[in-house]
């Protein structure tokens, strides 16, 4: 049997590193279909830190896509597992027959499913991408994204799968002992990416709570984002006093980020699509409820796991937030499907499906 090849077709260092380390640590030892990778980006020590994997790095999307297409044409039994995707040339190859549906398995990360960009280039490309997505052999996604995808592609097979968020299961009960009182701290967004709509989110928080809460905005990732960070900071200072606004421009190490999250009382995410599952998981683990846009279908996954969900359209106040915290504290977090290690079973099944080992 031909070994499955995993493709990280866009240079997203943080996510790519998370996926590679997860496969190295949790999957490679038990499955030959969890070891071969083609990745856009620099090695930066990844090969050394992931010795169980065979990783081929490419300088850009175009060179990787050309290599994938060549492999697909040379051996029609070769199957590929595309993580996130984000590579237009690969969608076009699937649409034109360069890659066959039986070779193309896609784990949806959110962005490459939704059509939120207003630029002309995107508007011209979206219909082609939509046609290509009808030809995917199988999609793997959250419950909400599967539901969203099925509305336009009902004939494509869909399987539940969660991004392998880095989590320590021993922390699942840690937050239950914490007493929450006094001025609330609200986390706005999960990164410095513009898709977080930080300024709109800050205005929404201010409309709900005024200048009575402390707002923390983590913007240390992606790099080279100084102009936008300053734009967000200035917009925030028009709404909140300096002592109530903390815009973080430096990238935080994982433990420091965990510490930051555990100082918060609420997470506020205004974006109208599924994203930021890693931050949501870590907040929920810490007993911190989240406010979602009702258009973000991840609320379906949360309610399926009996987790409280607040929406940006709700009338929010401290009493409502404290009640959501109380409800969250009563949930057995060891049973949540999208927490580690529970998502591991879904990954083992996904590998077997993509490799053709199970129907």
UniProtKB/Swiss-Prot annotation:
HAMAP family according to UniProt: WecF_RffT (MF_01002)
Subcellular localization(s) per the UniProt record: Cell inner membrane
Species of origin: Escherichia coli O6:K15:H31 (strain 536 / UPEC)
Top-level enzyme category: transferase
Transmembrane segments: none
Protein name: TDP-N-acetylfucosamine:lipid II N-acetylfucosaminyltransferase
Superkingdom of the source species: Bacteria
Principal location class: membrane
Keywords, ordered alphabetically: Cell inner membrane, Cell membrane, Glycosyltransferase, Membrane, Transferase
Pathway: Bacterial outer membrane biogenesis; enterobacterial common antigen biosynthesis
Family: Belongs to the glycosyltransferase 56 family.
GO molecular function: 4-acetamido-4,6-dideoxy-D-galactose transferase activity; fucosyltransferase activity
Purpose of the protein: Catalyzes the synthesis of Und-PP-GlcNAc-ManNAcA-Fuc4NAc (Lipid III), the third lipid-linked intermediate involved in ECA synthesis.
């Amino acid at each position: 049997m031909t070994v499955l090849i995993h493709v990280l077709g866009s240079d997203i260092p943080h996510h790519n590193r998370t996926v590679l380390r997860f496969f190295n640590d949790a999957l490679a030892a038990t499955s030959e279909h969890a070891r071969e990778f083609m990745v856009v980006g620099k090695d930066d020590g990844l090969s050394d830190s992931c010795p169980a994997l065979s990783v081929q790095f490419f300088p850009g999307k175009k060179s990787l896509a050309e290599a994938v297409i060549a492999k697909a044409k040379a051996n029609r039994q070769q199957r590929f597992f595309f993580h996130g995707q984000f590579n237009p040339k690969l969608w076009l190859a699937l649409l034109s027959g360069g890659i066959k549906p039986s070779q193309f398995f896609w784990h949806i990360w959110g962005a490459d499913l939704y059509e939120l960009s207003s630029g002309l280039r995107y508007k011209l490309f979206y219909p082609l991408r939509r046609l290509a997505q009808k030809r995917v052999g199988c999609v793997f996604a959250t419950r909400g994204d599967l539901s969203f995808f099925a509305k336009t592609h009902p004939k494509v097979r869909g399987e539940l799968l969660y991004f392998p968020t880095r989590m320590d299961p021993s922390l699942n009960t840690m937050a239950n002992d914490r007493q929450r009182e006094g001025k609330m701290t609200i986390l706005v967004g999960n990164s410095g990416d513009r898709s977080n709509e930080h300024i709109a989110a800050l205005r929404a928080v201010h409309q709900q709570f005024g200048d009575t809460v402390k707002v923390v905005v983590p913007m240390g990732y992606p790099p080279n984002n100084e102009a936008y960070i300053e734009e967000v900071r200035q917009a925030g200072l028009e709404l909140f006093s300096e002592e109530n606004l903390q815009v973080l421009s430096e990238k935080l190490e994982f433990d420091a980020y965990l510490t930051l999250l555990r100082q918060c009382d609420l997470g506020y995410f205004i974006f109208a699509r599924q994203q930021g599952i890693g931050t949501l998981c870590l907040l929920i683990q810490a007993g911190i409820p989240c406010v979602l846009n009702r258009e973000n279908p991840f609320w379906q996954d949360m309610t399926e796991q009996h987790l409280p969900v607040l929406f940006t359209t709700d009338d929010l106040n401290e009493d409502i937030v404290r009640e959501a915290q109380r409800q969250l504290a009563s949930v057995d977090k060891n049973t949540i499907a999208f927490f580690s290690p529970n998502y591991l079973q879904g990954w083992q099944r996904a590998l077997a499906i993509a490799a053709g080992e199970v129907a």
